[in-house]
Amino acid sequence: MNPLRPVDTLVVDIAIDNLSDNYSSKPSHISPEFNNVIAAGATEISGSTLCCAQLGLALVLTAVTGNQHHTLLFDAGPEGAIFLRNCRNLGVSLADVEAIAISHGHWDHMGALLDTLDHITRHNRGRQVPCHVNPGMFLERAATLTTGHIAPFQRVPSPDDLAEHGAQVVNSSAPRFLLDDCFYVSGEIPRVSSFEKGRPDHLCRRSAGEPWQPDPLIMDERYLAVHVREKGIIVFSACSHAGVINVLLNTREVFPDVPLYGVLGGLHLAGAAMERLIPDTMAHLKQFELQQIMPAHCTGWRALHALLNEFGEARVTPSAVGSRFTFG
C-alpha cells in the first residue's frame, strides 16, 4: 500500500451539518460562520447570508503542500439547493473540487449529489469529476420507527445517474489513495469491537416489492483519512455506522507508524439503542489519545455531553455548519 502523503495544511469547510452555532466561543483553529460569510463578501448578517443547518453532512477539504492545492468533496448532504447556497455563502468554489468521495449510501449524504455534479461541471468547463463509491451503496434502505412503521429512505442516485450528470464513477470496494496520495478512502471496515453491533432499526432490500431485510451493519460505509504534517492522521467518519472504535482501530492498523491526531464526523450515538453504547465508547476512545474529537451530524447531545465530561473542552470541539477548521 502506498504511504499517505503528509500535507502541510488541511482546511475543512463544514458545508452541511445538523447544527448551527455562531455564538459559542471557538479555539483558534476554527473560524466561525459569521466570520466566514463576511470574508466571502456578505455585507450584513442575515437569514439570506448565513448557512442552513440540515440533517446530513458535507465537507469540502483542501489539502495544501507547498504551492500545491487539492480539493475533495466528502459527501454532499441531503438536498442540492441548500448545499449550493451554503457553499456560495461561504465562498467555497465547487469548481475547484477535483474528486468526490461518498461515505455510504444514505440520502442525507448523497441527496444533493446530482445537483452538485451539475454545478461543478457547469463551472469547470465540463470536465468529468471522479466520484468514488462502492457497490453496496445502492440498495434500497429504510428504518423501523419507534411506532413500528417501516419508513423507506429516499433512493440515492445510481452509478448511471451519476455518470449522466458528469461523474467519472469509480465503483469499487477496495481502499484507495486520491489526489497525489493526499487523501485515503478506506475499504470495508472490519467489525472487531465487542460492543459496536450496528444500527438495529436499519433495513435494506435490493428492489421494490421484495421484503425488507435487517441491515444493522451498513457494510458499505467508508472513512476518509488525511495525514497533517507534525500532527498526525485526521479521520473523517461521516456516520460511524461501523462504530467509531472500529473505524479508529482500522486506521491505526492501516497506518501503524503515524499517530492519530483527531476524528471529525457523526458518531451515531443518538437514539435509545445507540445511546447505550456511550459509556463503552468513552472508555475505548481513551486508547487512541486523540488531540481533537470533533463530533458532528448524528452524534447526539448525550454523547456530546459525555465526550466533554470525559475529554474536556480543549480536546472536544463540536462541528457546526459554516465553520472552517484549519489544521497545520
Tell what function each PLM region has:
Residues F74, L179-E188, I234-S237:
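Short hydrophobic-aromatic micro-motifs
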Residues S48-L55, A63-A99, L114-D115, T121-H123, ...:
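Pre-active-site segment of Zn-dependent metallo-hydrolases
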Residues D13, H132, Q168-S173, Y184, ...:
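General small-molecule cofactor/ligand-binding pocket signal
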Residues L61, D75, C87, H104, ...:
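Divalent metal-coordination and catalytic microenvironments
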Residues S25-K26, L113, A142-T146, E275, ...:
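Short acidic, glycine/serine/threonine-rich loops at helix termini
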Residues E98-V169, G187-G198, A283-Q291:
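Active-site HxH/HxHxD metal-binding segment of metal-dependent hydrolases
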Residues M1-H69, V185-L224, V228:
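Zn-dependent metallo-beta-lactamase
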Residues A99, H106-M110, E210-S323:
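Cap/insert and terminal regions of metallo-dependent hydrolase folds
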